[in-house]
Amino acid sequence: MAERVLIVGGGDGGTILANALDKRRFDVTMLTASPKHMFQPALLYVAFKNASRDIAREQRTLLDRRVRLVHDAVKQVDLKAQVVTTASGERYEYDYVVLGTGIRTNPGEIPGLAEVNAEFGDYHSSVSQAEKLWSRLDAFQGGTIALGQSTPVIKCPPSPIEGILLTDELLRKRGLRDKTRLVFFTPYPRAYPAKPMNEVVEPILRERGIEIVPFFDVDKIDPETRTITSIEGDEIVYDLPIIIPPFIGADIAYEPANVVDASGFVIADKNTMRVKGTETAFAIGDGSTTPTSKSGVAAHLEAQAVAKIIAGEPAKYNGRTHCPLDMAFGRGTFVIGTYDAPVRKLPPTRLKHWMKMAFARFYWISLRGWLEPMFTVYFKLTEPRP
């Protein structure tokens, strides 16, 4: 009898895993609240370039026909009884469960941020929020734009740098750069957290006249005075704020409750993705505590490793990251590293930018696993060394 694999979440990790599992051995069911799958990196280009083509597709079209797809929100996961309960009250028993729940924004964590993001939008929450941000940028005629992350943990670590550089590009093309003060704030001691990449990034920001404010931990925002205040009491006054909100785990109750941390992220082994204290539960993607970037590539590689582990094959995820970084004006680079190898210093080139654009085009077929041989060779050739 086929073993039952339950996948919670229809993101890239869950979709890749569902397609990778051998359907002759496993009865695969995916539970996801949304009928559509969104290519989340596209929000960057909705917000800063008004590009909204091919952002989402029907989840059913991305899955092997033998995968059972159920559109229902998961509300409870009982890891002891091996049962998942949905919002409709349905109960699903499993032999293996893979939690690809993703994460959600939590602007209410910071006083004033919910009001600010409701007014100005952001490029990490939704298509509508990204469209709102574009409308604000499109109407902007000069003043101070302040962009940064409100907390250290965000989706796609390069995205703050991408946002500020694409803002700079937009302003220059519209002849507004000399009328604008661009401020980039970060809770880290430098513009990019990893020092080797910062040696690439920070000189470019300074060359383009972007002010860098390090060690800026956002405490509150006053929409009336248009002021962002740090925990240390420093202030940034803005005309247009672009603030990446805090993130928390999915709204799911777990039994036992101690398998999630204070932010709701599922505690998992960094190499096997097994959930704390279990042998039959795994957590992949943004919603886990694995100490790697919350990115599509990480979820992809975690999913491939979990597929092998469930099949009884030896496999480990080594923390590999491969995040594309759009440096604006047709140039780009990648943030590449593993748990054991430090992030590499890779200067931007036009080729790297086009590689990012090409992957966006190939994203949908990559979910089916059809490009896996190519990815395997590419990741091996670009593997960083300790």
Regions flagged by a language model, labelled:
Residues R25-T29, V67-V84, Y92, D168-G264:
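A Rossmann-like FAD-binding core segment of flavoenzymes
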Residues I284-F329, T333:
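A conserved FAD-binding loop/helix module that cradles the flavin
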Residues A2-E3, V67-E162, L166-G175, I242:
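FAD-binding core/adjacent interface of flavoenzyme oxidoreductases
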Residues A2-R68, T151-K195:
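Beta1-alpha1 glycine-rich phosphate/pyrophosphate-binding loop at the start
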Residues E109, A114-Q141, E235-L301:
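FAD-site-proximal beta/loop scaffold in flavoenzymes
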Residues G10, S88, T101-G102, E232, ...:
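Glycine-rich, N-terminal phosphate-binding loop of Rossmann-like dinucleotide-binding domains
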Residues F334-P386:
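C-terminal auxiliary extensions adjacent to catalytic cores
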